[in-house]
Amino acid sequence: MALFGENTVHAWAQINCVTGQDTIRDSYNVSSVTDIGTGRQQFNFSTNAINNDFAVACLSGNVSGSTTAPRTQNPDAEFNVAHFTIRNMNIDNNQSGTAVNDSLINVICCADT
């Protein structure tokens, strides 16, 4: 059964960015991931969104072992109908944060269809 309408999942992905090349483990409607720099990834849609008023949720950490410091993910650029960009930050000891690549980054994007 196809699901259409407002607030549906437009795209999702699970990626690995530790190796120096962002690798998509699995995804839906994500054609590629562009490594912009340490802790910065651009997720490119296979099919564009109808507008740039969509919501993105992210989480990151380690695939195996413990994630030793909290993480936060923030938009890194204005959303675009063709892609969105995030910045993955390591927040250790309540500092301002350091951009970090992680072995596990999950994103989900909900948008009008």
Task: Annotate each PLM feature.
Residues N51-F79:
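Terminal beta-strand-rich extracellular "head" domains
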Residues G37, P70-D92:
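Ser/Thr- and Asn-enriched, surface-exposed coil loops between beta-strands
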Residues M1-I50, N90-T113:
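Extracellular receptor-binding modules and their adjoining Ser/Thr/Gly/Asp/Asn-rich linkers
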Residues N16-D22, S31-S32, C58-S64, F79-T85:
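Short linear motifs at secondary-structure transitions and domain/linker junctions
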Residues V56, F84-I86, V107-C109:
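Hydrophobic beta-strand residues in large extracellular and virion-surface proteins
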